[in-house]
Amino acid sequence: MALINIKAPENIILKPHITVFGVGGAGSNAVNNMIGANLQGANFVVANTDAQSLEYSRCENKIQLGVSTTRGLGAGAAPEVGAAAAQESENEIRNYLENSNMVFITAGMGGGTGTGSAPVIARIAKELGILTVGVVTKPFHFEGGHRMKTADKGIIDLQQFVDTLIVIPNQNLFRIANEQTTFADAFKMADDVLHAGVRGVTDLMIMPGLINLDFADIKAVMSEMGKAMMGTGEASGEDRATKAAESAISNPLLDHSSMCGARGVLINITGGPDMTLFEVDNAANRIREEVNNKDANIIFGSTFNPELKGIIRVSVVATGIDADKIPLYKPVNSSATDLSIEEDEDTKLRAQSTQGDQPVHIEEIPNFNSYSNDEAEIADSLDQAPNSTNDDMEPRVSLTNDAGETPKSSFFVRMWGSLRTQNNNQIPERKNVVVGMPDEETKESDIHDIPAFLRKKRD
């Protein structure tokens, strides 16, 4: 009789894998602070071109970027060197990212390693189908314009590959720091934004609660959403829920300090066993009012934490903040003129004709090339025609600038400036202006206002 051995299946725990990837010196420091805060639910990886910096990292998973490219000496503030180093170590980066469902890439923009390597790592993550979130800092103003331009270029490169991007200008640290704040404590404040964002996501999936969220909910809010903001607030005592929510939605460190109009919002309200239903409702409604977008995808979760007895913590991730911001067209040298759209064409031309060498833009310019030579000579001589001395006539427009010099202007403007306007500066019909000849509907009294040589032409 054959014996059948039946083994119990292995207890396989299926849960999303979240990786925090620190790049460069600033990214490595952020990971060190998160490890020191004992953040649970995430794996940590640091990557740097500086071998000495890697030695001091608390993280176990380390990548020496570009061994042949930099020889462990850093990128020298050159983003192209940082990018080349990351490309050299692409296989190692890919190995650490595999099996991850979500990755937070943190770096400081403006240097060499973070600015150049972060976009390469983000590209690899996207190729692996990983939900990718970038959390980066921008330089202080005292670091100079060159470093700021480098940072802006790096942010543009990174944004191509991340689903959501959070930018923290270091200059905003002055909003919350005082004269006693140490340099290390100030940077830790910036790192806390990343810490709070990762904790807000992991708590929703691993902490017990009445309303738990799965990874699909997280992905629905953060996938391909562009610029975002994160905020966390804690409060106790009276109105603690509302106060915590208001603190979460007004993070002074972020580049985008308002979540108004966000397309996706992730809300996590955490408290002790004393948290009430009305408090959860007050906090959630306060955030919804701030978003002020009826079409926003708002995903809400609430969890319990015994350590927060008497305290309510509200974490918010608002995404798609810049979805409706389309760059407006601004004409060249538009600051030189201040013309409203309601002004008539005559007013526009007179204002623009006094702007010196500023270009003149009009809706319709006649095709003077179609005129005969005689007509062109007649039209060209209009600026030499004498003006009437009647008091009710508009004075000739001055075509001299402040220096007394005659600026260069188009033929159309010179011609228009020499013509006299009637009826409260109303523009005459263009067919009378172009060739200077009245039509059959012209009144007999108006003929005397036409120069004699034109009157003969008409006769």
From Swiss-Prot:
<keyword id="KW-0717">Septation</keyword>
<dbReference type="GO" id="GO:0003924">
    <property type="term" value="F:GTPase activity"/>
</dbReference>
<dbReference type="InterPro" id="IPR037103">
    <property type="entry name" value="Tubulin/FtsZ-like_C"/>
</dbReference>
<feature type="region of interest" description="Disordered">
    <location>
        <begin position="427"/>
        <end position="459"/>
    </location>
</feature>
<comment type="function">
    <text>Essential cell division protein that forms a contractile ring structure (Z ring) at the future cell division site. The regulation of the ring assembly controls the timing and the location of cell division. One of the functions of the FtsZ ring is to recruit other cell division proteins to the septum to produce a new cell wall between the dividing cells. Binds GTP and shows GTPase activity.</text>
</comment>
<comment type="subunit">
    <text>Homodimer. Polymerizes to form a dynamic ring structure in a strictly GTP-dependent manner. Interacts directly with several other division proteins.</text>
</comment>
<dbReference type="Pfam" id="PF12327">
    <property type="entry name" value="FtsZ_C"/>
</dbReference>
<dbReference type="Pfam" id="PF00091">
    <property type="entry name" value="Tubulin"/>
</dbReference>
<feature type="binding site">
    <location>
        <begin position="25"/>
        <end position="29"/>
    </location>
    <ligand>
        <name>GTP</name>
    </ligand>
</feature>
<dbReference type="GO" id="GO:0000917">
    <property type="term" value="P:division septum assembly"/>
</dbReference>
<dbReference type="InterPro" id="IPR008280">
    <property type="entry name" value="Tub_FtsZ_C"/>
</dbReference>
<dbReference type="InterPro" id="IPR036525">
    <property type="entry name" value="Tubulin/FtsZ_GTPase_sf"/>
</dbReference>
<dbReference type="GO" id="GO:0005737">
    <property type="term" value="C:cytoplasm"/>
</dbReference>
<keyword id="KW-0547">Nucleotide-binding</keyword>
<keyword id="KW-0963">Cytoplasm</keyword>
<feature type="binding site">
    <location>
        <begin position="112"/>
        <end position="114"/>
    </location>
    <ligand>
        <name>GTP</name>
    </ligand>
</feature>
<protein>
    <recommendedName>
        <fullName>Cell division protein FtsZ</fullName>
    </recommendedName>
</protein>
<dbReference type="InterPro" id="IPR018316">
    <property type="entry name" value="Tubulin/FtsZ_2-layer-sand-dom"/>
</dbReference>
<dbReference type="InterPro" id="IPR045061">
    <property type="entry name" value="FtsZ/CetZ"/>
</dbReference>
<dbReference type="InterPro" id="IPR020805">
    <property type="entry name" value="Cell_div_FtsZ_CS"/>
</dbReference>
<dbReference type="InterPro" id="IPR024757">
    <property type="entry name" value="FtsZ_C"/>
</dbReference>
<keyword id="KW-0342">GTP-binding</keyword>
<dbReference type="GO" id="GO:0032153">
    <property type="term" value="C:cell division site"/>
</dbReference>
<dbReference type="GO" id="GO:0051258">
    <property type="term" value="P:protein polymerization"/>
</dbReference>
<dbReference type="InterPro" id="IPR003008">
    <property type="entry name" value="Tubulin_FtsZ_GTPase"/>
</dbReference>
<feature type="binding site">
    <location>
        <position position="147"/>
    </location>
    <ligand>
        <name>GTP</name>
    </ligand>
</feature>
<dbReference type="GO" id="GO:0005525">
    <property type="term" value="F:GTP binding"/>
</dbReference>
<keyword id="KW-0132">Cell division</keyword>
<feature type="binding site">
    <location>
        <position position="191"/>
    </location>
    <ligand>
        <name>GTP</name>
    </ligand>
</feature>
<dbReference type="InterPro" id="IPR000158">
    <property type="entry name" value="Cell_div_FtsZ"/>
</dbReference>
<dbReference type="GO" id="GO:0043093">
    <property type="term" value="P:FtsZ-dependent cytokinesis"/>
</dbReference>
<comment type="similarity">
    <text>Belongs to the FtsZ family.</text>
</comment>
<keyword id="KW-0131">Cell cycle</keyword>
<feature type="binding site">
    <location>
        <position position="143"/>
    </location>
    <ligand>
        <name>GTP</name>
    </ligand>
</feature>
<feature type="region of interest" description="Disordered">
    <location>
        <begin position="383"/>
        <end position="405"/>
    </location>
</feature>
